[in-house]
Amino acid sequence: KTHIATIKDVTYWDGLVKYTQTRNKSWFDDFIVGEFDSYEVDYIGIYGLDNVLIDRIATPKIKTENFISKEFLLNLYKHRLSKFYIKIPEGIVEVFAATIHPSNDPKKNKTNPSGYFIMARLISPSFIANLEKISSSKIELVNANFSKEQDIESVIVPINLYDWKNRIVAKLLFERSFNLDFRSAKKILIIIIIAFILKIVVYLYYSKRWM
């Protein structure tokens, strides 16, 4: 399940709507803190319609309490869902954000938002190592202006990371070795050619005998 799918599912929830009104600490501890690990992120924050952080939970990777701007929340109110990247003191963070609605409005087009739900994960060395394993590539997190020349021994693909205003804040540089070993293919080709020549020789030999 993707993080986008998760945040879509969790943000049409009557209990969450009620929490934005009551700001009940016990509810937050039971249903958000208690289930935090299942979200597979480093940060969850819930904001009210006043654009003020109600509460948060985070791993030790993210110590910054509030990195979401009022300007962004006003934009989120209109668009309902967003994914973007932002630079904070700890590094580059991938953010998933959605408005909060009751359970009878899964498409979020019948009711006004009750608040905002924010999930984030740090693009950390462990995150990159996992991505390297999945993609079989060497990956670097580099600044927005970084560039690297292609060479004949590898394929380099930059992935731009955009903020919510569509500005590049960083890049993930995927590099994969392009070492094609033609020796095996060459051996197979030689065998095929030899077999073909032998076939012709045998054919000519027997055709002469029967003439």
Spans of features found by a protein language model:
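Cytosolic-side ends of inner-membrane transmembrane helices, especially those
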Residues: 195-211
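Extracytoplasmic/periplasmic sensory segments of membrane signal-transduction proteins
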Residues: 2-71, 75-77
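A short beta-strand signature within small-molecule sensing/ligand-binding domains used
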Residues: 79-83, 90-107, 115, 150-162, ...
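Short clusters of small/polar residues that mark proteolytic maturation junctions
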Residues: 57-59, 97, 173-174
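Short N-terminal helix-loop-first-beta-strand/juxtamembrane motif that initiates sensory/input modules
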Residues: 2-9, 34-53, 82-85, 114-123, ...
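Membrane-interface helix-start motif
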Residues: 130-132, 171-195
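Short, acidic, Ser/Thr-enriched surface-loop or helix-capping motifs
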Residues: 48, 162-163
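Short, positively charged
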Residues: 17-29, 136-146, 175
